Swiss-Prot record:
Stated name of the protein: Oxysterol-binding protein-related protein 7
InterPro entries from the UniProt entry: OSBP_sf, Oxysterol-bd, Oxysterol-bd_CS, PH-like_dom_sf, PH_8, PH_domain
Name of the gene: OSBPL7
Pfam family, one: Oxysterol_BP
Source organism phylogeny: Eukaryota, Metazoa, Chordata, Craniata, Vertebrata
Source organism (scientific name): Homo sapiens (Human)
Alphabetized GO MF terms: cholesterol binding; sterol transfer activity
Family statement: Belongs to the OSBP family.
Residues modified as Phosphoserine: 217, 226, 256, 272
Length: 842
């Protein structure tokens, strides 16, 4: 970010020291602008908008100044490289001048704005322009001062829903007397409690904004020269004003509201309320000595009262959600639940889950309910989601102090681990804590909602939630000894130790791209072709989300003729893949569903460049939606693993994805995976747009490939997709998602149905999953030698390998691709692979 950490400008009265006279003179040139005093007759004066180019000091010392375009409006000073960037919303940062300590140097025509965390140094060339900027900054600070008495209590704090209006036990007890479908329908239609929850959460959000503003006002009053000195026994409420050259942390929080969570902060605010109460009592009983000014005491009382209201509102919401939980549990445990359709049970579970996580995604399917029930459930889910989603959290950021360029996060992928997910999930941390045990009891239905199950489809058998053995460290493997002789070579031809692998195969990684197949199901139900393109784009981005925690290991390379199947009735698709070529290595796959078809053939080129490993995919991803006759195709972007030999490995994806519908040219989509730069904060960011035939932007997309994709203007927007939360102890399970944990699972029934070439039967991969490293390494060497022997025999006899379940096609331009020959599932059913001879691969 563009700022330089240094001591605040010297105060004139603090310049009395034994330093040389030149230092004293230099310090006396700086003037700290005092807090504006309210004057009669100024209430109606509104500050003007000020904009123009200013010089801003660079982050690093001795690096000089650079020109930035600044806009001062409503007390917020935004800056960017050019005026066009301001218009487009591409800001480098923003400063709340109302809550900053302002210092000016008239001789040097400089302005310093101290936000406590950062100091922004500005220089203005023209004396007239300098005076104009100083005057406008003073005016905006004065306007904020005038508004403080009126705004100390927010307008949203006036209404409070009494606890008597919450759903009563009588309402809950009335449900068991109804039939199964009538009970669910009545529950879905009863929106009074959820309406109040929605309203309460909306008001809480406004109250939290006001609490943050009051908190910053208190801190601002506390650190300016005229601030009162609070006795040391009141340290629980405030801290001593920092002396020259020393900086202290904030009083009640350590991060800005723009970076912190929203409702997750309530726990800390609640902890501060008793301290404020004790402070006010002790203040009243301690006489007039050390009393703060009227404004300071008024702000403290306002903060205490508003925090009490936030706590009361959240208690009401918790009571309402607890009642919803009890109703769901009663229906789940009732004897008639076994006669209730799976679709209704999963729909009810999705409803409760949407309340607890405040997800901004639309429910995937309502096919099992009648139209009235569909509409009721849809409206209920959408009423709550805009208010606690990342969209609304991001929209608050413009009005607060800390806007960072944040180049530090480039050095470690873990520095922003699951930021978007944490922000959203922490919003309801206190509420969902009491629901977590019940949610675990119904985790199958929860996975259905988050993972993409379609209501009305069978749930399938229970899935495992961890690997048989924890992942072992691979630090004892000398990567440098392996790679130093292979710089610039294709690493797909280099044999690696098994410790560098994860217990999944490249064929299974192709299937992992279908983790969010619910996006394709959703697209198949949308009539607008441009809207369908938005969900196809979200699906293309979601394929990369699972790689965020997987930079430390690589998948097994499949041998020629190896296959993999994945039949998921709960998700509504079945998938097959096969290694159709060895040199070059090409993996082909095909998935089919009643709503979509998905296929691709992909080959990778791996290059080692000393400190990073670059993976360049070559091929095309295809998706067809039979309902509309659409055929979408797009390319994949380059992936790069950094710090291969030392430090914390992290992965990034960069390049441009072009999505087009070969059957409809009315729109197309371009998505850019931004490459990390040292001086930029766009690590892991994606930016894109759905464009019309003429190039007009129809939908603007933005987000991060590991956190979510949003539609609309930044920083707000509608959440189209966000990744599922990671399983517990995912670090001990190779960083696998829940879906990845299930890919290599092998049951006795499934083993009887698989062909002998299926990846699940590969011994080296199975041994690694079980933690037997020595056996895995021995089996890996044996399997690789068998493949070399087979290839030698085929070359000596001029035998060309023929793929078993895929066939190659070529167009008039010579482009080749692989498609399924539609024999896999037919042979699996009759005569069955257990009754057929297969290739011996291991």
């Amino acid at each position: 970010m563009d700022f330089q950490e240094r001591d605040p400008p010297f105060l004139p009265e603090s310049a009395q020291s034994s330093k040389p006279s030149s230092a004293q003179q230099a310090s006396e040139l700086w003037e700290v602008v005092e807090e504006p005093r309210v004057r009669l007759g100024t209430e109606g004066v509104m500050p003007e908008r000020q904009e123009g180019h200013l010089l801003k000091k660079r982050k690093w010392p001795l690096k000089g100044w650079h020109k930035r375009y600044f806009v001062l409006e409503d007390g917020i000073l935004h800056y960017a490289t050019t005026r066009q960037d301001i218009t487009k919303g591409k800001l480098h940062g923003s400063i709340d001048v109302r809550l900053s300590v302002m210092s000016i140097n008239k001789k040097a025509q400089r302005i310093d704005l101290d936000t406590e965390d950062n100091i922004y140094h500005l220089k203005i060339k023209s004396q007239d322009l300098f005076q104009s900027w100083v005057a406008q900054l003073r005016a905006h600070r004065l306007a904020h001062r005038l508004d403080m008495p009126r705004g100390s209590l927010p307008s949203t704090a006036h209404r409070k829903v009494p606890g008597a209006q919450l759903p009563t036990a009588a309402t809950a007890s009335a449900l068991p007397g109804l039939g199964p479908r009538e009970k669910v329908s009545s529950w879905l239609r009863d929106s009074d409690g959820l309406d109040r929850c929605s309203h309460e959460l909306s008001e809480c959000q406004g109250k939290l904004q006001e609490l943050h503003r009051l908190l910053q006002s208190l801190e601002s009053l506390h650190r300016i020269p005229s601030a009162p000195v609070i006795p040391t026994h009141q340290a629980s409420v405030t801290t001593e004003r920092p002396k020259k050259g020393k900086r202290t942390s904030r009083m009640w929080c350590t991060q800005s509201f723009a970076k912190d969570d929203t409702i997750g902060r309530v726990g800390r605010l609640h902890g501060s309320v008793p301290n404020l109460s004790r402070y006010l009592e002790s203040r009243d009983s301690s006489g007039t000595r050390g009393l703060p000014p009227t404004d300071y005491a008024h702000l403290q009382r306002s903060f205490w009262a508003l925090a009490q209201k936030v706590h009361s509102s959240l208690s009401s919401v918790l009571a309402a959600l607890t009642m919803e939980r009890d109703q769901l549990r009663d229906m789940h445990q009732g004897s008639e639940l076994s006669r209730m359709g799976v679709s209704e049970a999963s729909t009810g579970q999705r409803r409760l889950h949407s309340l607890s996580t405040s997800s901004d995604t639309t429910a995937d399917s309502f096919s099992s309910l009648n139209p009235e029930e569909q509409e009721a459930l849809y409206m209920k889910g959408r009423e709550l989601t805009p208010q606690l989603s990342q969209t609304s959290i991001l929209s608050l950021a413009d009005s607060h102090t800390e806007f960072f360029d944040a180049c530090e996060v480039l050095l470690s992928a873990s520095s922003s681990e699951n930021e978007g997910s944490e922000e959203e999930e922490s919003c309801t941390s206190e509420i969902t804590t009491s629901l977590s045990e019940e949610m675990l009891d119904l985790r199958g239905a929860e996975r259905c909602q988050k993972g993409g199950c379609v209501p009305g489809r069978p749930m399938g058998p229970p899935r495992r939630r961890c690997l048989p053995a924890a992942s072992g460290p691979g630090a004892d493997v000398s990567l440098w000894n392996i790679l130093r002789n292979n710089i610039g070579k294709d690493l797909s031809k280099v044999s690696m130790p098994v410790q560098l692998n994860e217990p999944l195969n490249t064929l299974q990684r192709l299937c992992e791209e279908l983790e969010y197949s619910s996006l394709l199901d959703q697209a198949s139900r949308i009539a607008d072709p441009c809207e369908r393109m938005v969900y196809i784009a979200a699906f293309a981005v979601s394929a990369y989300s699972s790689t965020y925690h997987r930079a430390g290991c690589k998948p097994f390379n499949p041998v020629l003729g190896e296959t993999y199947e994945c039949e998921r009735p709960d998700r509504g698709f079945r998938f097959i893949s096969e290694q159709v070529s060895h040199h070059p290595p090409i993996s082909a796959c095909h998935a089919e569903s009643e709503n979509f078809a998905f296929w691709q053939d992909m080959k990778w080129k791996n290059k080692f460049w000393g400190k990073s490993l670059e993976i360049v995919p070559v091929g095309t991803v295809n998706v067809s939606l039979p309902r509309f006759g659409d055929h979408f195709e797009w390319n994949k972007v380059t992936s790069c693993i950094h710090n291969v030999l030392s430090g914390q490995r992290w992965i990034e994806h960069y390049g441009e994805v072009l999505i087009r519908n070969t059957q409809d040219s009315s729109c197309h989509c371009k998505i850019t995976f931004c490459k990390a730069k040292y001086w930029s904060s766009n690590v892991h960011e994606v930016q894109g747009a759905v464009l019309s035939r003429s190039g007009r932007v129809l939908h603007r997309l933005f987000g991060k490939w590991h956190e979510g994709l949003y539609r609309g203007p930044t920083p707000g927007g509608q959440c189209i997709w966000k990744p599922n939360s990671m399983p517990p102890d995912h670090e001990r399970n190779f960083g696998f998602t829940q879906f990845a944990l299930e890919l290599n699972e092998l049951t006795a029934e499934l083993k009887r149905s698989l062909p002998s070439t299926d990846t699940r039967l590969r011994p080296d991969q199975r041994y690694l999953e079980e933690g037997n490293i020595q056996a895995a390494e021995a089996q890996k060497r044996r399997i690789e030698q068998l493949q070399r022997d087979r290839r030698k025999v085929m070359e000596e006899n001029n035998i060309v390998h023929q793929a078993r379940f895929f066939r190659r096609q070529t167009d008039s331009s010579g482009k080749e691709w692989w498609v399924t020959n539609n024999t896999y599932w037919r042979l699996r059913a009759e005569p069955g692979y257990g009754n057929m001879d297969g290739a011996v691969l291991w």
